């Protein structure tokens, strides 16, 4: 099924220099139906011009990823080198979700710019907790989060951002329905922004500081990614779905195998996938550390564009399609081949999204590992799998069970991805099918996927299993219970297992017992890719930017516990960092969920000091194997990680964190970098970083450093004192020396690496990227 090579030349389509030109009079295709003044024709013409310049320099065929990235270069005269060059790029769009938007907008306000420089939107999806059902939960969220929603709405109106009110849906589904288009380059303050790759966009998850760069009019910096090609052949069969493609790829590449790379799908099998199915695959590319994932433009994307009222974009993309797919003989740094005809459903987990199990072997794995076989809850939806097709196919499974008098044996929760999807599946009877089987429809929001779940069916600490169509399944992520074994699968498999109430049920081979006692088998799911009667937009939940923002005030109550202006971090004083304690040596997986938990902490995302009370409370202390219990090197007493950091800060003691592999994987949340900076940390020293977190640390004036020899991690003890010397000579490509002093007074030097370029070193010296922006703008 799978073949892998280091370098691969794949025949795709011949390449030639070309010119895409339209007259000024013909420029009439809006990039979004909601933004008639932003036209697409000039975007495609600019991409074409830049690519012709780049081709003259490289003189070789280009991958799709290269075409879109290099087509947005600020200076196409500079020759890009994959894996080496830092690119200066000009994205067309920025998207912010409400949890990360707060700090991003507070930073933008500090820049003193009057309006955002590119089309930008705010999406209210992260602050809505699931508990009872959609209506009750939404009312509660609007009441509890009124201060934050009012701030975001007024900031959007003041600074020119579109505002999607609570209940609109999940950011990535809204982007796909309204803003994404083939060839788009966009950034979003959420790690699953790559979802838009299902519509041929190059969409990258970033921290808020990166978003601020683009919103103030600066180019966005990205190290030129390598490109991993995934060739798809054949056609999905029976119970297999697009979700199984990325579950399989995650098993191959692992959670860090895509780091520093874009995953690009191609091959005849692509045309058998729906646009939203391709979005699912791109969405979960975040779980392998990929910069983003992309599909080439095809008729399935055109169908989706037309179904969502963007016929003009589909027509224009058809005429520009040569630049929306890879060239013939494009070179990939790595190749994976998957025959869709042979791909079986997969279930990944628990506790990590890359532990992949074919469905046929999953029962055996459950028994062998002693995982709780009883399925307590099944959840479908989320930004990964909440399309009309996902819901229709899942409903087809439920209808079969209902015809035999069978309802869900597990608690069954459904999360529509957007108000448009909710209204459409309600009109078409799909929601009624789910509720008839005992399902509970949750709000159009992230909910349990990000830990916004006030779960009451299982006491915390009780071993249990859940299965979801979400993207992540880290320990405690969904419900805060470290004993919840969370598994990830397609919505069809989740639905079937929920009906059976067991992880051991294989819908492809096993039978259910009907109300009459007779056994029956479920047929493979089916469902329309797009609604036959078209989409129902539902309630209007969009607030466009104000035409006149001069009179709009954006205020923050100085006594607020939810929002606070950001005090500038101090600039580097030009001295080495010496005799610093190790706040914590984190053992094993340390995601951004471990560093800055979500769930109940989301309400403090706009208040840095308050949310800093969750810093690293989920990380395992290598010294004692405990969570949130570290030794204060000054007093000798044990305390929580945040309290110990605050004690150091009060005494003027700088500190460092030591970490393992792929430190900071997961969410794009920049709070995981802001918090250690705020509490007095100066460096994070690990075996390896996840891309977004490493950048976020740099943006906040921290030193993200990696062991030159990963085995040196084992030489560090929590009781050590460390010094980072020679910082005045810190230059790109040159290692940093760390002197480690043991408790007995002996010392050793350890070499550390970094990935700073010259401009990023200016962030460090200025104290943060925002400080540097303000210096450059004279504000």
Curated annotation (Swiss-Prot):
Cited InterPro entries: Acnase/IPM_dHydase_lsu_aba_1/3 (IPR015931), Acoase/IPM_deHydtase_lsu_aba (IPR001030), Aconitase/3IPM_dehydase_swvl (IPR015928), Aconitase/IPM_isomerase (IPR050926), Aconitase_4Fe-4S_BS (IPR018136), Aconitase_4Fe-4S_dom (IPR036008), Aconitase_dom2 (IPR015932), Aconitase_mito-like (IPR006248)
Enzyme Commission code(s) on record: 4.2.1.3
GO molecular function, one term: 4 iron, 4 sulfur cluster binding
UniProt xrefs under SUPFAM superfamilies: Aconitase iron-sulfur domain, LeuD/IlvD-like
This protein's UniProt keywords: 4Fe-4S, Iron, Iron-sulfur, Lyase, Metal-binding, Mitochondrion, Transit peptide, Tricarboxylic acid cycle
Family membership: Belongs to the aconitase/IPM isomerase family.
Name used for this protein in its record: Aconitate hydratase, mitochondrial
Organism from which the protein derives: Gracilaria gracilis
């Amino acid at each position: 099924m799978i073949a892998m090579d280091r370098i691969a030349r794949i025949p795709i389509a011949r390449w030639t220099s070309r010119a895409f030109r339209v007259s000024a009079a013909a420029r009439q295709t809006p990039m979004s139906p909601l933004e008639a003044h932003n036209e697409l024709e000039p975007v495609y013409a600019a991409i074409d011009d830049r690519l012709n310049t780049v081709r003259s320099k490289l003189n070789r065929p280009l991958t799709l990823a290269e075409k879109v990235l290099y087509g947005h270069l600020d200076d196409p005269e500079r020759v890009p080198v994959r894996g080496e060059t830092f690119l200066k790029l000009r994205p067309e769009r920025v998207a912010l979700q409400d949890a990360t938007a707060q700090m991003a907008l507070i930073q933008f306000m500090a820049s003193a710019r009057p309006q955002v420089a590119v089309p930008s939107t705010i999406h209210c999806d992260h602050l809505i907790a699931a508990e009872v059902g959609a209506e009750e939960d939404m009312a509660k969220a609007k009441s509890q989060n009124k201060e934050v929603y009012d701030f975001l709405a007024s900031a959007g109106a003041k600074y020119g951002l579109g505002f999607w009110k609570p209940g609109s849906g999940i950011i990535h589904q809204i982007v796909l329905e309204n803003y994404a288009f083939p060839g788009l380059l966009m950034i979003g303050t959420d790690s699953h922004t790559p979802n838009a790759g299902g519509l041929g966009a190059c969409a990258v998850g970033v921290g808020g500081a990166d978003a601020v760069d683009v919103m103030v009019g600066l180019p966005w910096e990205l190290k030129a990614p390598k490109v991993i090609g995934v060739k798809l052949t054949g056609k999905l069969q029976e119970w297999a779905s697009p979700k199984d493609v990325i579950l399989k790829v995650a098993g191959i590449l692992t959670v860090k195998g895509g780091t520093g790379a874009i995953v690009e799908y191609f091959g005849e099998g692509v045309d058998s996938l729906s646009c939203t199915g391709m979005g699912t695959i791109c969405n979960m590319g975040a779980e392998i550390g990929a910069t983003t994932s992309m599909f080439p433009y095809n008729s399935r994307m055109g169908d989706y564009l037309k179904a969502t009222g963007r016929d003009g974009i589909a027509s224009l993309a058809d005429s520009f399609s040569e630049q929306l797919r890879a060239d013939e003989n494009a070179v990939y740094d790595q190749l994976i081949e998957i025959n869709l005809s042979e791909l079986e459903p997969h279930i990944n987990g628990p506790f990590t999204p890359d532990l992949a199990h074919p469905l046929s072997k999953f029962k055996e794995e459950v028994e062998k590992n002693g995982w709780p076989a009883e399925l307590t809850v099944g959840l479908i939806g989320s930004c990964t799998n909440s399309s009309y097709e996902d819901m229709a196919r899942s409903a087809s499974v439920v209808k079969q069970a209902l015809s035999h008098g069978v309802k869900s044996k597990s608690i069954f929760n459904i999360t529509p991805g957007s108000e448009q999807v909710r209204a459409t599946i309600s009109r078409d009877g799909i929601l009624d099918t789910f509720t008839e089987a005992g399902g509970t429809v949750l709000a159009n929001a992230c909910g349990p996927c990000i830990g916004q779940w006030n779960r009451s069916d299982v006491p915390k600490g009780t071993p249990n299993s859940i299965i979801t169509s979400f993207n992540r399944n880290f320990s405690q992520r969904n419900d805060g219970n470290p004993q919840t074994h969370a598994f990830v699968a397609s919505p069809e498999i989740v639905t079937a297992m929920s009906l059976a109430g067991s992880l051991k049920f294989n819908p492809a081979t096993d039978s259910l017992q009907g109300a009459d006692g007779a056994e029956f088998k479920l047929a493979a799911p089916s469902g329309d890719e797009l609604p036959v009667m078209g989409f129902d937009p539902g309630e209007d939940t969009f607030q466009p930017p104000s035409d006149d923002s001069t009179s709009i005030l954006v205020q923050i109550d100085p006594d607020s516990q939810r929002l606070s202006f950001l005090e500038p971090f101090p600039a580097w004083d030009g001295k080495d960092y010496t005799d610093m304690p190790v706040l914590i040596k984190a053992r094993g997986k340390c995601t951004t969920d471990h560093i800055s938990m979500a769930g109940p902490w989301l309400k403090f995302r706009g208040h840095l000091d308050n949310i800093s009370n969750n810093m690293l409370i989920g990380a395992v202390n290598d010294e004692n194997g405990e969570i949130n219990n570290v030794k204060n090197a000054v007093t000798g007493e044990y305390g929580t990680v945040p309290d110990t950091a605050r004690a150091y800060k009060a005494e003027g003691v700088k500190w460092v964190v030591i970490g393992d592999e792929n430190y900071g994987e997961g969410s794009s949340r920049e709070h995981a970098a802001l918090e250690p900076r705020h509490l007095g940390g100066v460096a994070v020293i690990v075996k390896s970083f996840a891309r977004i977190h490493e950048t976020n640390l740099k943006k906040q004036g921290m030193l993200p450093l990696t062991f030159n020899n990963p085995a040196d991690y084992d030489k560090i003890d929590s009781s050590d004192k460390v010094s980072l010397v020679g910082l005045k000579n810190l230059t790109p490509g040159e290692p940093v020396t760390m002197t480690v002093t043991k408790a007995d007074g002996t010392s050793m030097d350890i070499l550390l690496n970094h990935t700073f370029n010259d401009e990023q070193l200016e962030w460090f010296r200025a104290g943060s990227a925002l400080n540097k922006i303000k210096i450059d703008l004279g504000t």
